[in-house]
Amino acid sequence: LITSAEVVADYLRETRGLKVGVVDLVMFRPFPGDQLSRILKGKKGVVILERLDQPLATDLPIAREVRAVLSKCQENGITPLNMPYPELEMYRQGDTPSLYSGSYGMGSRDLQPEGIIGAVENMLPDGKHKKMFYLSIDFIRDMPYTPKQKIHQEAIQDAYPGIKELGIRGSENPNLMPKEAITVRFHSIGGWGAITTGKNLAMTLYDLLG
């Protein structure tokens, strides 16, 4: 995720002039709230992408932690002379960014530049501003493949109104790979020698391509 997000951020800065950046969270416990409170202060919007889904939870795990940090920073701003959380920044009005939460990779989907671009576009002034969304998933297809699929989709929409709007796609999917680079995708079943096969494949490609 991070390497892809960094490349997309560079692309959006160069082609659209957007002021976007990437924060790589490498530790979950103890949660680095003090560092995040400094990094996020004054930003307009923050999107947190997580490769999981918890439909019955208030927030996804990292989004929940970040929201708690922002809330504590706001509490510091209420009583600046006696901050209840001195290890965190003090947020005044306008310091708190809008928080967005995105789920990606569901159904073993690869995260393409299109998905990350969609997450950024969602936050822009003319974006959809969906607070919680799923990247690159068409819950309801605009053009069903078959009449049966159309009937099935209608049943889904009747049971879950608004489900179509949960999916977000970007307006483009640029090829941001380095020149002459190739990608290899390896599928396997657990317990069938996937690790050894993957290592052998990597060594073979290295010997062939250098």
Per-region residue spans from a language model:
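Short acidic loop-to-helix transition motifs that present clustered carboxylates
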Residues: 25-33
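Peripheral docking tails and interdomain loops at the edges
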Residues: 50-166, 170-171, 190
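Anionic-ligand anchoring segments at beta-strand to alpha-helix junctions in alpha/beta enzyme folds, i.e.
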Residues: 1-26, 182-210
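Hydrophobic/aromatic beta-strand patches that form the interior of the parallel beta-sheet core
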Residues: 21-23, 47, 100
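A structural-propensity feature for long, helix-poor, extended segments
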Residues: 33-56
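Feature representing long, continuous alpha-helical segments
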Residues: 3-6, 34, 64, 68
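Phosphate-binding P-loop
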Residues: 176-180
